[in-house]
């Protein structure tokens, strides 16, 4: 066996060693020797050629796993193996980019039509004149007609179909939803889960309790159910608490019921109220107390028992139209009611305070009469006393003042006033007078007989300001020596162009 002559032989040897053992023994390298003699057998030559061919085949398979390039070498038998290249091989070992992996399609194969984008030249941006649209969109045109503007069956929920057929369909849908609402309430389901019709609106009672305003057809269905089964069922009835109380009172023989009888009537006809009794019974009591249409009647001697009767006010009339208790026509309100006990007590106390307030005498000046005594109430002069404590304090102060006056002798202890008159006469101005012509003279220790300090004119005594300024402060006749800046003592002290030496003094 010859030694390898190149790197390719080394690679081939390694590949052969890594092959599994299950390969036939013919793949292994035969231990043959090359002899140049002519005595070799023809069979051995054929076997050698077969092995050579098999080795070349396996070498080509291994080249697929190696990098691109050209390899050359000698075989184990010493024969020169021709160099293999990517160009000569049947497999292309050249590197491929991303474009090579993309599949190629042709328009003729898949029948793809090229898309032509809209441009300003092919009509997308070519707008017609406004006059053409104005002519087309006149009255009666398809563009401006409401029937064509809002079409049913579209994505928008606002779309609907107009015309006779559309109106019939809408009416049928309303009737269907209304019937489904009745069925939902009859089966005990919540009304919120059923599609409510336009006629099925919520109604809230005045004193609490949720009710619903049903249509006439729905009300007839509810009434028929009560008449057929005797009760409404386990579902909540669509009546307010005021409606329930009114029905109970009107269905009774005496037109008056006690509170417990109202409870029992409601629970017998509507089994829904057999549960959670405390809550709705409180609402019933509030409705009876805070609505003027219900009147409380005391028990008569021939009807002993506990609790008063409740009946309807005689002037409330028929609050529910045509016997429909789903909604009242109007709320009944008594115009004038008797004042409550608190108001009556407050009024009596206020009247009692006004009676105990003492009267006061006020003197007024009048040209015809000297004095006039008038008695005024507490609302005109004295502020209203609001509490009993203030009344007691004022009474105590009056008693103390009376006792003090009695001690001083101003008031007789027997209770009659003393004869001492402390009143002063009232002065009345009857006319307007004038002052006297003579005036009193001021005497200051006899030195001055006149109230004036100077009897003569002050203008002649005061100094003249013009003469004072001219003669005293400013003398016009004297001359003041002037300062000669040219020939004086301070000549050439400032910088001058004629004396350059003075520049150093700056």
UniProtKB/Swiss-Prot annotation:
Coiled coil feature spans: 38-66
Subcellular location: Nucleus
Polar residues: compositionally biased ranges: 79-88, 346-356
GO BP, sorted A to Z: anatomical structure morphogenesis; cell differentiation; cell fate specification involved in pattern specification; determination of adult lifespan; embryonic morphogenesis; nematode pharynx development; positive regulation of macroautophagy; positive regulation of transcription by RNA polymerase II
Keyword presence, Zinc-finger: no
Primary location: nucleus
Biased composition annotated in UniProt, kind: Acidic residues: 1-10
UniProt keyword list: Activator, Coiled coil, Developmental protein, DNA-binding, Nucleus, Repressor, Transcription, Transcription regulation
One Gene Ontology term of the molecular function aspect: DNA-binding transcription factor activity, RNA polymerase II-specific
Tissue distribution of the protein: Strongly expressed in the embryonic pharynx, particularly pharyngeal primordium precursor cells. Expression less strong in the embryonic gut. Expressed in adult intestine.
GO cellular component, as recorded: nucleus
CDD domains: FH_FOXA
Cross-referenced InterPro entries: Fork_head_dom, FOX_domain-containing, TF_fork_head_CS_1, TF_fork_head_CS_2, WH-like_DNA-bd_sf, WH_DNA-bd_sf
Disruption phenotype: Worms are unable to form the pharyngeal primordium with the pharyngeal precursor cells, ABaraapapaa and ABaraapppaa showing arrested development prior to terminal cell division. Some mutants exhibit malformed rectal tissues and fail to undergo proper embryonic elongation. RNAi-mediated knockdown at the L1 larval stage reduces survival.
Ranges annotated as biased composition (Low complexity): 69-78
Chain intervals for the UniProt region annotation (Disordered): 1-88, 184-210, 332-366
Domain of life: Eukaryota
Function: Acts as a transcription factor required for formation of the pharyngeal primordium. Binds to the consensus sequence 5'-T[AG]TT[TG][AG][TC]-3' with variations of the sequence affecting onset of target gene expression. Becomes associated with pharyngeal target promoters by the 8E cell stage, playing a role in inducing large-scale chromatin decompaction, prior to the activation of transcription. Binding with target sequences in pharyngeal cells may be repressed by the nuclear lamina protein emr-1.
Subunit text: Interacts with elt-2.
Protein name from the UniProt record: Defective pharyngeal development protein 4
Species, as recorded: Caenorhabditis elegans
Name of the encoding gene: pha-4
